[in-house]
Amino acid sequence: MSAIRYELIKKCKQSGARLGRVYTPHGCFDTPAFMPVGTQATVKGMSPDEMKEIEAQIILSNTYHLHMRPGEDIVKEAGGLHGFMNWDRPILTDSGGFQVFSLSDLRDIKEEGVTFKSHIDGSKHFISPEMAIKIQNDLGADIIMAFDECIPYPADYDYAKKSLERTTRWAKRCKDAHRNPEKQALFGIVQGGMYKDLRQQSAYELLELDFPGYAIGGLSVGEPAEIMYEMLEVTVPLLPEDKPRYLMGVGSPDYLIEGATRGIDMFDCVLPTRIGRNGTVLTSKGRIIVRDAIYARDYTPIDPECDCYACRNFTRAYIRHLLKSGEVLGIRLTTWHNLRFLINLMKKVRQAIMEDRLLDFRDEFFSKFGYKKI
């Protein structure tokens, strides 16, 4: 029996979007959903209670970083991630593949796995598909990911094909190594670069392995938005209707809405926390850099339409002052706001799906935010 169950509640008559709910051992979450990223078993600047206040239903943690520090053995002793970080709602862990291929000084990719140098101290490490699953079994998240190879953009066709076929073999090894399928759902990850036929090949090969959910990886890595949408349009229709679909590493408002219109259920990204730390905030009328001098005497909220703690209590002028003074509260408030903005955006997306008006909502939002339709 699978650790999770996907319930399809409604299909949007105006688009390919769907309203759903995913049930896990630690409760359910509504889809389409944005998952805040807690890389080091914490969403930067936010406590678990604050994450609940902004209505985060599920968060993501990072296998690579937790393996490096403090080590999965410590997390397991503490009662898994849920006990370690005192979070009683669903958690998803990535496999560490993306970090191994992007952060580390790569040494060698072989069929057995990947040898790499730590980004912390330069020490040499090896991760195989079996090890990635063992680490995630110890971390204890509700949803875990197969170990995949993340190729750069651009990549030539032959390498993309060779890589996706290795990713399929690794996915089978991950499934064979998984020791806790009744408590942790293992998702396969579709790869294939920016080639339609390779994306289709990857999807078909993973479908044969019958995972409880499917992710689409290797997108939003520098390619034009039109290409990402093309890859979604050839991949998503191949994925099972009765299982969740997860677009990895995507979190800008336009990508969230466009992904939802194409049938994606789950998204994650560090964008809201990362840009918040740099003084950039998302508003219903577009991004603003609140630390800029223009806001020194702006006594309005970050976004008058937002209901978050920062917008209910503080002004742009005050938050700018905090950021310019190097006060931690400034970063906390911009982070709080950005996370709430995206979580609330997904609530509006779900409501628009329920009312069969997602494309209308998209057009209205894009017009106010300053996006162009592609």
Swiss-Prot record:
Keyword Electron transport recorded: no
EC number: 2.4.2.29
Cofactor: Zn(2+)
An example molecular function term from Gene Ontology annotations: tRNA-guanosine(34) queuine transglycosylase activity
The protein's annotated pathway: tRNA modification; tRNA-queuosine biosynthesis
Keywords from the UniProt entry: Glycosyltransferase, Metal-binding, Queuosine biosynthesis, Transferase, tRNA processing, Zinc
Residues engaged in binding substrate: 94-98, 148, 191, 218
Residues involved in Zn(2+) binding: 306, 308, 311, 337
GO biological process: queuosine biosynthetic process; tRNA wobble guanine modification; tRNA-guanine transglycosylation
Annotated region described as RNA binding, given as residue ranges: 249-255, 273-277
HAMAP family, per database record: Q_tRNA_Tgt (MF_00168)
Family to which this protein belongs: Belongs to the queuine tRNA-ribosyltransferase family.
Identification of the protein by name: Queuine tRNA-ribosyltransferase
